[in-house]
Amino acid sequence: KMGYWGFFPADEQWGIVPVWGFGTVIASKHPRAQVGEVVYGYFPMGTHLLVNVDKANDVSFFDNHPQRVSSSPVYDNYLRCAQDPSYQEDSQAWLLNYRPLFMTSFVLDDFVGEHISDKVTTVLLTSASSKTAYGCAHLLMKHKAQRGGHYRVVGLTSAANKALTESFGCYDEVLEYKDIEQISRDGESWVLDFAGNKQLLLDLQDLLGEKLSREIFIGATDVKSQTNKPKGKLHGQLFFAPHQVKKRTEEWTREGFNERYAKAWSSFNAHMQDKIQVVEYQGAKAIQDLYQQGLAGTLNNEEINVLTF
């Protein structure tokens, strides 16, 4: 449905899981792809990737392999780490785990800043313990004053994740899902939905009524709720990060976009350094076991993982 099996096609009955990662060029017949250089981008969950280098410049290159079918050019782009202002070799673990998510956090915060009005007093983020959500929350808090905003940044999460989410220090307030009645209705609200739980969204629509001025759908971390399809119409809009990336890249230039992103990333990375532990896994069996934990929803939210074959 989301097109993920098209990135690195396999035989019909199989799918190759795509992951964000770092790769080192070990052989090249293209003058703009140098052996030994490190690049960041979308890779198959494997040891090697053969690319057809296209649109190469000093900052990045694209893969135009004919078998590859991507939903956006963002996924075909490989960034040269030597030219990346946000790259540091000793922070690879953080970039691996957060960069693709924080890129969404970054452009979503930018989108909010572009469209939010001074009538909005509450910005609600569901699945508040998810990386994309609390990355965005950090930026919403950071940019509140310079935007002249009067909003409070409120996270909604499960009872099990409430204390952890509060410890991140990215929200004005964190509420359990069962406590949504405590949400202020004094002014207008935005909902940034990362959970994809339709029943929760319907409950928020009923609770906030006309005070809900915007509802944005970003993700679907609540996998179990996807089988539950309650009746009722949602009134929001889908946020597709690559569209905002493309818009701002055209307006700010690629260099300007990367500089703004690097500044935001530096702020978030410094804020989170003492709150998350890096754990490394090696070998196919360890990777498979961790993948199964992800499917079961049992990953440790206090850890970020680095996987190598």
What are these regions (language model features)?
Residues 2-49, 55:
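Glycine-rich beta-strand-centered segment in the early N-terminal region that forms part
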